[in-house]
Amino acid sequence: MSVKIRLKRMGSKKRPFYRVVVADSRSPRDGRFIAQVGTYNPLTEPASVKLEEEEILNWLNNGAQPSDTVKNIFSKAGIMKKYHEAKYTK
């Protein structure tokens, strides 16, 4: 089972709101997920992002792969830098 960290679309039509979730790569975009690790609202200025950093780092260390968009969100929040430092400075 390949696990991905990706965005799950919520909100109404033309008013998107996303949950950052950990899900099986075979499940549909808005389908079943394993854990919710944050939220992302692109409509606010600036876009509001709330992430559970410890849980995200735990999932990344266990092999979860972030989607491209989620990887960009994590990079802006500094999570990818912490992950790479922890992974390669052992």
UniProtKB/Swiss-Prot annotation:
<protein>
    <recommendedName>
        <fullName>Small ribosomal subunit protein bS16</fullName>
    </recommendedName>
</protein>
<dbReference type="GO" id="GO:0006412">
    <property type="term" value="P:translation"/>
</dbReference>
<keyword id="KW-0687">Ribonucleoprotein</keyword>
<dbReference type="InterPro" id="IPR000307">
    <property type="entry name" value="Ribosomal_bS16"/>
</dbReference>
<dbReference type="GO" id="GO:0005737">
    <property type="term" value="C:cytoplasm"/>
</dbReference>
<dbReference type="GO" id="GO:0003735">
    <property type="term" value="F:structural constituent of ribosome"/>
</dbReference>
<dbReference type="Pfam" id="PF00886">
    <property type="entry name" value="Ribosomal_S16"/>
</dbReference>
<dbReference type="InterPro" id="IPR023803">
    <property type="entry name" value="Ribosomal_bS16_dom_sf"/>
</dbReference>
<comment type="similarity">
    <text>Belongs to the bacterial ribosomal protein bS16 family.</text>
</comment>
<dbReference type="GO" id="GO:0015935">
    <property type="term" value="C:small ribosomal subunit"/>
</dbReference>
<keyword id="KW-0689">Ribosomal protein</keyword>
